[in-house]
């Protein structure tokens, strides 16, 4: 099925939010598994449960609280999704990405995406942060794309380019900010590949993905980025490496969601501090920063 939402549905949700808060966000942040603690850094926070927002889907995954939080972070007016939606929850991509178009109508200019991911690159360690340089949309190979169906010209063009999906200037600023933090581990950078889930990958799949050039694997992020770029948002994002994928048939290890959440808890503070510092570097209308 193509998009089940009309332009008016996006408008209605945006109008509802604008009538229930005086805040006007410039930056939207999607918090991945176990990374929702970033909202605790917001000042003047105002929270809405997804269930009370017209047309909003609801998050069903542990580690995803299901709240939309408005507030100020390091001088930037933000709206944060404390919990995202996934294909494996049964949602089509047009529902997964519904909030992104709403953010555009709220006046958001930049989308920051975060996720928990498995490390395919052998140089990555658990707890590393990978700046996303590019992505591979594996579901797209079989026609699963959030832009499938009639194009909504009021958001963007029929055939948007994705070669520059992740903003180069913000990636450079991210490296500078990381150096200022003085972390021992370097900030990684690489390609994120999305699978549908909910099962974790087989050994053969992991080997294939690595051969395709992917550095980290997860079950989210890509559809939101595609829709964000379609409607003209600046995008950058990070993967928190919460486990190293199994590449060896002799290995006794197994990936599990509890491990992902625990690793997220341990490293989340570092990522939250990083995103908070980086927020001041995000250009907004009327500012040069």
Curated annotation (Swiss-Prot):
UniProt keywords, alphabetically: Acetylation, Cytoplasm, Glycosyltransferase, Phosphoprotein, Purine salvage, Transferase
Record-linked SUPFAM superfamilies: Purine and uridine phosphorylases
Positions with a binding annotation for a purine D-ribonucleoside: 88, 201, 219, 243, 257
Classification via Pfam families: PNP_UDP_1 (PF01048)
Subcellular localization, as worded in the UniProt entry: Cytoplasm
Primary location recorded for the protein, binned into one broad class: cytoplasm
Coiled coil: none
A GO term for molecular function: guanosine phosphorylase activity
EC number per UniProt: 2.4.2.1
Disulphide bond pairs: none
List of residues binding phosphate: 33, 64, 84-86, 116, 220
Chain positions with Phosphoserine modification: 251
Residue positions where N-acetylmethionine is found in the record: 1
Residues with site note (Important for substrate specificity): 243
GO biological process: purine ribonucleoside salvage
One cellular component term from this protein's GO annotations in UniProt: cytoplasm
Quaternary structure annotation from Swiss-Prot or TrEMBL: Homotrimer.
Family that this chain belongs to: Belongs to the PNP/MTAP phosphorylase family.
Name used for this protein in its record: Purine nucleoside phosphorylase
Species the sequence originates in: Bos taurus
């Amino acid at each position: 099925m193509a998009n089940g939402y009309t332009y008016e549905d996006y408008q209605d949700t945006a109008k509802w939010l604008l009538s229930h808060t005086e805040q006007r966000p410039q930056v939207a942040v999607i918090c991945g598994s176990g990374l929702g603690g970033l909202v605790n850094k917001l000042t003047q926070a105002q929270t809405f449960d997804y269930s009370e927002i017209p047309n909003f889907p609801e998050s069903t995954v542990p580690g995803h609280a299901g709240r939309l939080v408005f507030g100020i972070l390091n001088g930037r007016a933000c709206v944060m999704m404390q919990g995202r939606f996934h294909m494996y929850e049964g949602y089509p991509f047009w529902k997964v990405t519904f909030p992104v178009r709403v953010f555009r109508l709220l006046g958001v200019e930049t989308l920051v995406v975060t996720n928990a991911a498995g490390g395919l690159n052998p140089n990555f360690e658990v707890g590393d942060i990978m700046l996303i340089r590019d992505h591979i949309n594996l579901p797209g190979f079989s026609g699963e794309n959030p832009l499938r169906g009639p194009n909504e010209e009021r958001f963007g063009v029929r055939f948007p380019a994705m070669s520059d999906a992740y903003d180069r200037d913000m990636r450079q600023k991210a490296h500078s900010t990381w150096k200022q933090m003085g972390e021992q581990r370097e900030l990684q950078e690489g390609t994120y590949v999305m699978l549908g889930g909910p099962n974790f990958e087989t050994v053969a799949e992991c080997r294939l993905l690595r051969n395709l050039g992917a550095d980290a694997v997860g079950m989210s992020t890509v559809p939101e980025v595609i829709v964000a770029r379609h409607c003209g948002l600046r995008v950058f994002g990070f993967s928190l490496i919460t486990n190293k994928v199994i590449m060896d048939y002799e290995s006794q290890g197994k990936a599990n969601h509890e491990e992902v959440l625990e690793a997220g808890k341990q490293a989340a503070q570092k990522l939250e501090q990083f995103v908070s510092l980086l927020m001041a570097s995000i250009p907004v209308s009327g500012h040069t920063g």
